[in-house]
Amino acid sequence: MNRKQIAKGKLVRRFGINIFEQPKYDKILKKKPHPPGMHGKARKAKITEYGKQLIEKQKIKFTYGVSERQLTNTFKEAKKHHGVTGDNLLSILERRIDNVVYRAGFAISRAHARQIVSHGIIILNGRRVTIPSIILRANDQIQIKEKDSLKKLIRSNIEKTSSLRNLPTWIEVNADDLNIKVKHAPSRDEIPTLANEQMVVEYYSKRA
C-alpha cells in the first residue's frame, strides 16, 4: 500500500465512513473500525460542537478533493442561491465536472477524474476543457476526445465501476458513445449522504 492509500485509509477510519466510495476502504473500516491512535474499545474523547462541525467540513472537503479556499468559495456561492444553503452547497459540488466524470463511471476515483479532465481528454459542449472545477448546468454534454486508446481506457473504467456505484438520476450516460448529459441540477435526495452539510453551514456561518 503506498503513502497516499495509507493516508486515505486513516481518513476513512477517522471519519468512520468510506468517503471515497471504494471497496478497499470498506475492508479497512471493517478490519479497523476505530480511529487512528485508538485501539479496541478505548474511550473516545468528548468532541466539542466546533469539533463536530470541523469533522463534517473535512468530510466534504476530502470527499470532493477540494481545497479549503475552493470549499469556502463554494459555500459563499451556495448562500447566493434560493433554497437551503446546505443543499445548494452539495448540488454545486456534485456538478463539478470532475465529480460528474466520476459519477458517470468514466473514472475509478475523483482523483482519477481530475487527472482525466486536466489532461484535456474531456470535451464539454464541443470544446476541450482542462479545469476540473468547472460547474456544469442542465443540458451540458460531455464527450471523450477522439482517440481510440482514450476511449478504450474510459470503457475499461466503466466496466470496472458499473457494479460498484449507482448512476445518479440527474445525469444521462451513453456508454456506447461515451457521452454524458446533465439532465438537471441534483436535489438533496439525489445526492449520497456522506456528511452533515448543515453542520458545515454552521461552521462557515460563524466565520463569515
Swiss-Prot record:
Q: Which GO terms describe its biological process?
A: ribosomal small subunit biogenesis; translation
SUPFAM superfamilies named in the record: Alpha-L RNA-binding motif
Q: What is this protein called?
A: Small ribosomal subunit protein uS4
Keyword terms, alphabetized: Ribonucleoprotein, Ribosomal protein, RNA-binding, rRNA-binding
Q: How does it assemble?
A: Part of the 30S ribosomal subunit. Contacts protein S5. The interaction surface between S4 and S5 is involved in control of translational fidelity.
- What GO cellular component entries does it have? small ribosomal subunit
Role played: One of the primary rRNA binding proteins, it binds directly to 16S rRNA where it nucleates assembly of the body of the 30S subunit.
Q: What superkingdom does the record give?
A: Bacteria
Belongs to which family?
Belongs to the universal ribosomal protein uS4 family.
Matching entries from InterPro entries are given as: Ribosomal_uS4 (IPR022801), Ribosomal_uS4_bac-type (IPR005709), Ribosomal_uS4_CS (IPR018079), Ribosomal_uS4_N (IPR001912), S4_RNA-bd (IPR002942), S4_RNA-bd_sf (IPR036986)
Cite a single GO MF annotation. Answer: rRNA binding
Q: Which residues form the S4 RNA-binding domain?
A: 95-157
